[in-house]
């Protein structure tokens, strides 16, 4: 069988059926398997909407078919939506029933989880910015407790001196106490500290006596220091144990080298050099151990086609190629073959074992077959790693894996065949009749009993036979009991998380021969502290310094404060080199010697496992997809845990249907190409630095990204004047920081760049997905200027007020009938957004749109001398455009009402030839470290196409649209 057969995909389009309101009511997919190309199955997902156009329910193809015979089968999701579009109740077969209610400012007020846990938020009162003060939690049969407290800085001299005015000073949360001590002008924290909760304590921040709360905390306080440049990039980080990381960047803002100084030691180089292509892709990186990694890309598609890691000629240990991976793709980007030219072809039991993997897909791009090599003595895949083998002393055999899925995308069977090694087996997974919940058949092979292995929120309560799982009130895995003993202490592994659901500690207890061994891990900024106790005696303390910037590689320094193993050098450096999806395949030490080598099956099992010593192998914590592997065999991704032996998540997606109706499916069943960075949604792998969120922001880098909004509002650095004019009310220009929530409601959003999103909360849809996985840095202020209520809104930013190294990004969101005008006059930037009312017969700016723009400009510039009663035609807008030194207009002009000037700085987004066109206007204002200010506007014509329904962020149901840019231009304003 050929790996890619174009005939297989003929006649298998994806079809969306729209109703007369433009809503997708059917999604048709045509399924054909490579083994049975003559058979084709039509799979239909159904969606319904209420009379107001809000989504009311969805059902996937599998449940839709079952519902025809069994009326008790429920849709995957049902929504009850308020008139405002806010989803008040979500009923899901995977994640249960969730209630949520926002306040008048669209802030979370109350939520009730599927397990009956309620959370309540409290905010500042009137005449304050409306920031959150606390979050309370109530479990069934328990008293309500406050699990989060926020204390915000005022404006006294000491706080201003540390740039803390308006910032959160102290945050008591589920992990302990986080404090911000000082912040740079760019927004980068200069010093911050963390004080963990006692192991025996629970977060209960009742009352107002902070001294009483401190009794719940450990006496240890861990403080991290940073020094940043004018662009907000970290130059030096000193971790809580005194280890220092230093970084240097090139003129484009990319990392070029980095160094590490362990506490009390000499500085050593980690990254010698990094080179990049014009597109910003890494071409070559050389590390301090002399190992060189070279990346190659396909010219036409820019897909990664080669990763070569080697000790080059002239290295003190001699030349050696560690890996030379070559990738072959089909036309849509599925990997067909991976060849490792660094490995030799071997022979075992009369079979030829080639160092390559091949893959076959169905018409839905799900992996259905994989060929590769494995260790000849490897047992059936389980939660445990296979027996370790010495390096270069392995016999290999070929394997074939076949994967079978149901029509909802549930992986139901993994059939493993290795004939030469007599190692063939089948892993079956039992899927519930009523949901996408599923467990290994070793737990049950009865589809009617699957639901009993999950709680109401879709969290699995048993891992393997006899291994129980416990979850906390916030839906986080709290405890695994791998061995339960009657009348004796059980083995266990427990976890604790911060307010962002990120793990901050892990404790594993194991009983053996009347002795208790306790292993603890504390996760700090750039550091892990691992300890081992035998009984009450501290036996070992290992500090793992995690290098934040090292190219694509992950680098760790292993420093033993106590109990250093004799076979391992103290302060050993471990460089981990990855593959296309970020899996750690090679570990090399600081002298360029190989420590370990690991190869993986699709979906994450270990096929090859070699190391030079047992102890060094046991210290390897990160493996498949670059994620941490726990003693349970689970991989920790950040928001969820993953079962590699079942190819499934342990719990329903906390982000809802961000990746489809199946909340348990792993990376769309395409694990060779796709990588999930945090357990929420898959994408293509990109190593994210712990120091930087995104490379230097430029106006050109915004092309094709799609409209943006704010996920939640927060304080920003820049001051500016804001004015709005509604149909029945005027608001005079005022500093935006002095506005009440009512003054800015539905018109102005401000936030730091980390809170950027593609989600339009008021319209209940996602304008693409770009910003969901690519947040900006916090040295960028976001300003989203909506129109007034059948009126207009405007802002005036003094460019001199932008601080060096900071940027301001201004947008109107998605323009579907409004006008956005931007311009610079002298040292001031202006943006005017005219609203939509009842459109005129001749133009689409709004009921009084042209006049509103003129009046808004006069509000912001009283001496502008602009006529307040212009002719109501779009050509009149040229008067405003010409008033500015440089400016732009994005408008929606019907045929016959266009602006009669053909210029790059004017965009009519009502262009014929495309459907569902929208306009985008991004203005980027930047001041570099030398104090030079630049201002530019990107004008873009885009299309929003029906793509998916019911993408959700938490409990809020939303529609996902696909954004495609059709044409764009950048206009320099200054």
From Swiss-Prot:
<protein>
    <recommendedName>
        <fullName>Toxin subunit YenC1</fullName>
    </recommendedName>
</protein>
<dbReference type="InterPro" id="IPR022385">
    <property type="entry name" value="Rhs_assc_core"/>
</dbReference>
<feature type="repeat" description="RHS 3">
    <location>
        <begin position="322"/>
        <end position="336"/>
    </location>
</feature>
<dbReference type="Pfam" id="PF05785">
    <property type="entry name" value="CNF1"/>
</dbReference>
<feature type="region of interest" description="RHS-repeat associated core domain">
    <location>
        <begin position="600"/>
        <end position="680"/>
    </location>
</feature>
<dbReference type="InterPro" id="IPR011324">
    <property type="entry name" value="Cytotoxic_necrot_fac-like_cat"/>
</dbReference>
<keyword id="KW-0677">Repeat</keyword>
<keyword id="KW-0964">Secreted</keyword>
<feature type="repeat" description="RHS 5">
    <location>
        <begin position="398"/>
        <end position="412"/>
    </location>
</feature>
<dbReference type="GO" id="GO:0005576">
    <property type="term" value="C:extracellular region"/>
</dbReference>
<comment type="function">
    <text>Part of an orally active toxin complex (TC) with strong insecticidal effects on larvae of the Coleoptera Costelytra zealandica, Acrossidius tasmania and Adoryphorus couloni and some Lepidoptera larvae. The TC has an endochitinase activity.</text>
</comment>
<comment type="similarity">
    <text>Belongs to the RHS family.</text>
</comment>
<feature type="repeat" description="RHS 2">
    <location>
        <begin position="290"/>
        <end position="304"/>
    </location>
</feature>
<feature type="repeat" description="RHS 9">
    <location>
        <begin position="630"/>
        <end position="644"/>
    </location>
</feature>
<feature type="repeat" description="RHS 4">
    <location>
        <begin position="354"/>
        <end position="368"/>
    </location>
</feature>
<dbReference type="InterPro" id="IPR037040">
    <property type="entry name" value="CNF_Rho-act_sf"/>
</dbReference>
<dbReference type="InterPro" id="IPR041508">
    <property type="entry name" value="TcC-like_repeat"/>
</dbReference>
<feature type="repeat" description="RHS 1">
    <location>
        <begin position="165"/>
        <end position="179"/>
    </location>
</feature>
<dbReference type="InterPro" id="IPR050708">
    <property type="entry name" value="T6SS_VgrG/RHS"/>
</dbReference>
<keyword id="KW-0843">Virulence</keyword>
<comment type="subunit">
    <text>Semipurified toxin complex consists of at least YenA1-YenA2-YenB-YenC1-YenC2-Chi1-Chi2. The Yen-TC:K9 subcomplex is about 26 nm tall and 22 nm in diameter with 5-fold symmetry and 5 copies of YenA1, YenA2, Chi1 and Chi2; the chitinase subunits may be solvent accessible on the exterior the complex. The Yen-TC:K9 subcomplex has no insecticidal activity. The native complex with additional YenB, YenC1 and YenC2 subunits is 16 nm taller and is insecticidal; the toxicity-conferring subunits are present at about 1 copy each.</text>
</comment>
<feature type="repeat" description="RHS 6">
    <location>
        <begin position="490"/>
        <end position="504"/>
    </location>
</feature>
<feature type="repeat" description="RHS 7">
    <location>
        <begin position="570"/>
        <end position="584"/>
    </location>
</feature>
<dbReference type="Pfam" id="PF18807">
    <property type="entry name" value="TTc_toxin_rep"/>
</dbReference>
<dbReference type="InterPro" id="IPR008430">
    <property type="entry name" value="CNF_Rho-act"/>
</dbReference>
<feature type="repeat" description="RHS 8">
    <location>
        <begin position="596"/>
        <end position="610"/>
    </location>
</feature>
<feature type="region of interest" description="Cytotoxic necrotising factor domain">
    <location>
        <begin position="699"/>
        <end position="940"/>
    </location>
</feature>
């Amino acid at each position: 069988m050929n790996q890619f057969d174009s005939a297989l995909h003929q006649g298998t389009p994806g079809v969306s059926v729209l109703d007369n309101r433009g809503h997708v009511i059917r999604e048709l997919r045509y399924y054909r398997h490579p083994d049975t190309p003559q058979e084709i199955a039509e799979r239909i997902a159904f969606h319904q909407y209420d009379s107001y156009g809000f989504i009311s329910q969805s059902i996937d193809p599998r449940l839709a078919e079952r519902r025809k015979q069994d009326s008790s089968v429920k849709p995957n999701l049902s929504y009850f939506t308020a008139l405002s579009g806010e989803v008040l109740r979500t009923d899901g077969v995977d994640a249960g029933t969730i209630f949520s209610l926002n306040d008048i400012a669209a802030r979370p007020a109350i939520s009730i989880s599927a397990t009956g846990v309620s959370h309540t938020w409290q905010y500042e009162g009137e005449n304050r910015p409306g920031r959150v003060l606390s979050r309370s939690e109530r479990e069934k049969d328990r008293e309500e407790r406050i699990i989060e407290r926020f204390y915000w800085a005022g404006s006294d001299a000491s706080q201003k001196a540390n740039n803390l005015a308006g910032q959160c000073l102290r945050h008591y949360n589920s992990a302990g106490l986080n404090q911000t001590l000082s912040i740079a002008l760019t927004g980068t924290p200069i010093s911050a500290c963390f004080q963990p909760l006692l192991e025996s304590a629970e977060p209960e921040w009742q009352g107002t006596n902070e001294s009483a709360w401190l009794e719940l905390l450990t006496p240890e306080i861990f403080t991290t220091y940073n020094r940043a440049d004018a662009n907000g990039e970290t130059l030096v980080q000193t971790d809580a144990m005194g280890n220092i990381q230093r970084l240097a960047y090139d003129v484009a803002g990319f990392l070029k080298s980095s160094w590490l100084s362990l506490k009390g030691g000499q500085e050593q180089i980690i990254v010698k050099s990094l080179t990049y292509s014009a597109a910003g892709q890494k071409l070559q990186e050389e590390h301090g151990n002399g190992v060189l990694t070279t990346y190659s890309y396909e010219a036409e598609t820019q897909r990664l086609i080669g990763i070569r890691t080697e000790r080059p000629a002239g290295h003190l240990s001699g030349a050696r190629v560690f890996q030379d991976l070559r990738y072959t793709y089909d036309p849509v980007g599925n990997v067909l073959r991976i060849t490792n030219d660094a490995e030799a072809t071997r022979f075992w039991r009369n079979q030829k074992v080639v160092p390559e993997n091949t893959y076959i897909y169905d018409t839905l791009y799900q992996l259905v077959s994989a060929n590769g090599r494995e260790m000849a003595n490897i047992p059936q895949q389980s939660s445990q790693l296979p027996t370790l083998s010495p390096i270069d002393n392995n016999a290999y055999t070929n394997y074939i894996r076949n994967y079978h899925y149901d029509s909802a995308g549930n992986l139901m069977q993994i059939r493993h065949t290795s004939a030469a090694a007599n190692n063939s087996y089948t892993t079956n997974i039992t899927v519930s009749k009523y949901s996408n919940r599923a467990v290994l058949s070793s737990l049950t092979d009865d589809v009617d009993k699957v639901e009993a292995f999950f709680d109401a929120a879709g969290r699995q309560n048993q891992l393997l036979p006899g291994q129980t799982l416990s979850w906390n009130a916030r839906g986080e895995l709290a405890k695994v009991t791998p061995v339960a003993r009657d009348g004796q202490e059980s083995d266990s592994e427990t976890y604790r998380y911060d307010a962002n659901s990120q793990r901050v500690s892990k404790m594993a207890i194991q009983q053996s021969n009347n002795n208790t061994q306790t292993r603890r891990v504390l996760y700090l900024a750039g550091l892990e502290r691992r300890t081992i106790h035998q009984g009450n005696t501290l036996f070992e303390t290992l500090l793992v310094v995690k290098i934040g910037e090292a190219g694509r590689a992950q680098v760790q320094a292993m420093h033993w404060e106590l109990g250093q193993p004799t076979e391992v050098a103290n302060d050993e450096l471990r460089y981990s080199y990855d593959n296309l999806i970020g899996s750690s395949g090679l570990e090399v030490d600081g002298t360029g010697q190989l420590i370990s080598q690991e190869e993986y099956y699709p979906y994450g099992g270990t096929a090859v496992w070699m190391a030079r010593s047992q102890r060094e192998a046991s210290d390897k914590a990160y493996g498949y997809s670059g994620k941490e592997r726990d003693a349970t065999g689970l991989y920790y991704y950040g928001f969820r845990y993953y079962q590699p032996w079942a190819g499934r998540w342990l719990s329903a997606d906390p982000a809802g249907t961000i990746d489809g109706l199946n909340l348990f499916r792993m990376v769309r069943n395409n694990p060779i190409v796709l990588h999930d960075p945090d357990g929420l949604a898959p994408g293509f792998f990109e190593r994210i630095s712990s120091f930087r969120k995104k490379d230097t922001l430029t106006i050109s880098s915004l092309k094709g990204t799609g409209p943006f909004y704010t996920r939640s509002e927060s304080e920003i650095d820049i001051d500016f004047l804001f004015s709005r004019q509604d149909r029945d009310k005027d608001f005079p220009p005022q500093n935006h920081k002095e506005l009440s929530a009512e003054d800015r409601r539905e018109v102005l959003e401000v936030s730091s760049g980390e809170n950027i999103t593609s989600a339009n909360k008021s319209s209940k849809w996602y304008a693409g997905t770009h910003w969901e996985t690519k947040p900006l840095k916090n040295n960028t202020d976001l300003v989203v200027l909506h129109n007034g209520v059948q009126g207009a809104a405007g802002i005036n930013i003094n460019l001199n007020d932008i601080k060096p190294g900071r940027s301001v990004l201004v947008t109107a969101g998605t323009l579907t009938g409004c006008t956005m005008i931007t311009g610079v006059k002298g040292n001031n930037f202006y943006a005017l957004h005219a609203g939509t009312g009842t459109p005129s017969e001749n133009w689409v700016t709004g009921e009084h749109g042209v006049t509103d723009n003129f009046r808004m400009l006069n509000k912001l510039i009283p001496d502008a001398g602009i006529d307040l009663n212009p002719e109501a035609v779009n050509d009149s807008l040229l008067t405003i455009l010409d008033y500015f030194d440089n400016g732009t207009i994005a408008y929606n002009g019907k045929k016959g009402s266009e602006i009669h000037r053909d210029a790059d700085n004017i965009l009519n987004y009502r262009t014929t030839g495309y459907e569902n066109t929208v306009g985008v206007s991004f203005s980027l204002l930047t001041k570099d470290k030398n104090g030079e200010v630049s201002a530019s506007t990107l004008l873009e014509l885009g299309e929003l196409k029906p793509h998916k329904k019911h993408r959700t962020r938490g409990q809020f149901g939303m529609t996902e649209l696909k954004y495609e840019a059709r044409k764009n231009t950048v206009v320099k304003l200054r």
